[in-house]
Amino acid sequence: QMPTFTHAITNTLKVGFLVGILSTLIGLLFAYVEVYVRMGKFTGGLFKVVSMLPVVSPPFVLSLSMIMLFGKAGIITRFLLKIYDNSVYGFWGIAIVQTLTFFPVCYMMLKGLLKNIDPSLEEAARDMGASRWKVFTSVTFPLLLPGLGNAFLVTFIESIADFANPMIIGGSYDTLATTIYLQITGAYDKAGAAAMAVVLLCITLAMFAVQKYYLERKTAATLTGKASRGRMLITDRSVRVPLTVLCSLVALFVIMMYICVPIGACFPTWGYKFFPLTGKWFKLVFTRYHGFQAFRDSFILSLISAPITALLSMIISYLVVKRK
C-alpha cells in the first residue's frame, strides 16, 4: 500500500536523523571526557563500561527495559509517579532506545580521533589567550568534523536498518524495516518487500554519497599517527563538574535499564506482584518454551559466523590498505 509505504519512509528518516544527531553528541561527550578530562579511577572505569554495555548486549534489551520501567505497568510511571496512561511506544520510544543502543559506536570512533589530535596545537591556542571553548570550536572541532560526519552516517544507517527495537517498542509507528517484515509475513508479498528493501538501500547509499562529497570539500585535515607529546588533562572544576554530571546522568540511566531486566525476570507477575522473587520463569524457558534449543542454535550460529566474519574482515582490510 503506497500511503503506508511513504509514511514508513518519512518515519524512518525522522528517527534516523534524530538518532544520528543524539548518538553523535552523546558519543562525543563520553569520548571528550575520557580523552581530555582528568577523572577518578572509578568514575572513568564506570563510564567506559557503560559506553560498551549496549555493544555487547542484545539489541532488544533496552526496548524491553523501557517498557518495564516507563510503560503503563512500569515501575517508575505507575508505581512511583502514579501515571496510569503513559505509553512509551512510538517515535520517542524508538529514538531513545536506539540512541542508547548506538551511541557507543560514535564513542569508539571519536575517541580514536581525539587521541590522535596533537596536543601542541591546542596548547598553542591556549598560550595565545584563547579560552577552552574557543580552542574547541576553532581547533578541535574542525579536526573532528570528518569523524563526526562518519559517526552520524554510521548511526543513521544502523537506525534506519534496525528491526528489533522498532518491532518491540514501535507500536503503530511504522518504519521501513518493520514494514518490509510485515509485507513478507502478513501480506505474503515478497516482490513488494524486495522493492522496499531496494528503497532502503538507496537511502543509505545516498546518505553515504552526500556525506563523502561534503567532507571531501572540507579543507581541514585530520591528524593521524602518534601525538608529539602527552596531553595535559583538564582539572578545572568549571569544566570537569558539568561534563561529569552529564555523563553520570546518561550512565545511571543506562545502568538502570540493564538492572531492570534480570530483576524483572524474578518477579512473579510483572506490574502487579513483585514479591517473593522467584526463578520459575527461567525454569519454564528451558523446559516448556524451547529455550535450550534456541540457546543451542544461537551458539552454533555464532561459532560458525564469527570466524568467517573475522577472516573476511582481515582479507578485505589487507587488500584495502595494500592497494593504496
Which ranges hold each PLM region?
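Short alpha-helical segment immediately N-terminal to, or the first helix within
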Residues: 113-114, 138, 166-169, 182-183, ...
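Internal catalytic domains of large membrane-associated glycosyltransferases
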Residues: 104, 123-124, 134
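Alpha-helical transmembrane segments of integral membrane proteins
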Residues: 209-246
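Glycine/proline-centered hinge or cleavage motifs at structural transition points of membrane proteins
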Residues: 128-129, 142
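A short amphipathic helical element positioned immediately N-terminal to and/or at the very start
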Residues: 1, 277-286
